Amino acid sequence: MILTHTHMVFENLITYGILVDPVQIIAFALSDPNTWPSSYLIIVSNIFIIIALHIERSLSALAMSEKMGYTIQMINLGAILLIPLIVLKVLTTSTAVGSAMVLTVHSIIFMKLYSYHEVNRWLREEWAPLGLKSAMKQPGITSCVFGNDESNSYWNNIDQVITYPDNLTIRDIYYFLLAPTLCYQMNFPKSSKVRIRFLLRRLFEMIFLIHLFVGLIQQWVLPVTRKSMMPFVEMKLTIIIHQLLLLAIPNHFMWLIFFHGFFHSTLNFIAELMRFGDRRFYRDWWNSETLTYFWSNSNIIFHKWCMRHVYRPLVEMGYSKWEGQTFVFVLSALYHEYLLAAPLNMFRLWVFLEMMLQVPMAWILSKYVRGLYGNAVVWICIILGPALVMHMYIHDYYVFQERKVNA
């Protein structure tokens, strides 16, 4: 495998030469500030945050009914997702990268504020009438307020225990929004101090991996795309397979670089800067023998949010565990489709359908394939899975943009 990959690298260098140019990306980003509506949309998102805080304060003071508060919350949350879509659709000057960034930020704010509203509702229902000692005995309340068992070792480092409704402050909500978690709780575990060396190592990793990621695109992906200059929707099946195989290896490298750069370097950098104690962002997904284990351990932050605010409520409503898991997977597939198809303005459902195909594949793996064979199948699904299908979108977007320029 090492020899094969080395051969492919040298073959690429001999064929195309050295194409890596970090300055090109910076020059493109700074070329025209008027094409940055995404930056303004991210700033505007603060309005939704302030509205969410005001709703919770009003509910805690009994200034509005729960029904009215819930209605306003849903309108506010819906606006977080819909307004950037409408603005980006009208203002065509925004770049695809900028659009993807703003939709990612707004979707993260949506999930965080949904968790914020839900937890505060639980606290209003169970904490206030019972008091501290009685509430601590209630199942589910402890994890909402003090965190889960994995974080209890950091308890002594929490500066001050906050109780409801003293948590409804600007400082509290913005700490939660900036922290590397999607699930709200009043008292987050904290480390005792900021480790400067650890922070600098993570910063160096982030800078290095960003340049490596961009270099792979310039050196490996763009030449292959330019060579075909035909969108996948117009290709024959044999050409599609050939093109995907050419992109599979660089795409997989890019996925691994992105994973390490984001889930390890970036999230740990943010956590260290904020003294955030719960650092379990992923587990050993590379040892996965089933797709279920892979999806639940490669992104623990999102998995926790889905389990807490989607899966468990569905099970409590009477749905089976399998139905709950399937719904979570459908939600995840729609989320990935939203983040990719909307910025590129290409609604083809490729990512959604590919991820939905993994539902029966996950069932087959869990029933009939285990051990090393199961791990091998999981890796094949990773290499030829959603990441590669996402690349199909980007490939077609690039081809269509080149056609517009040359028209």
Where does each model-flagged region fall?
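Non-catalytic, membrane-anchoring transmembrane segments at the edges
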Residues: 1-152, 166, 170, 242-251, ...
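Hydrophobic alpha-helical membrane-embedded segments
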Residues: 4-8, 107-123, 210-214, 254-276
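Membrane-interfacial catalytic/cofactor-binding modules of polytopic membrane enzymes
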Residues: 154-205, 210, 226-344, 373-407
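Core alpha-helical transmembrane segments of integral membrane proteins
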Residues: 212-215, 219-228
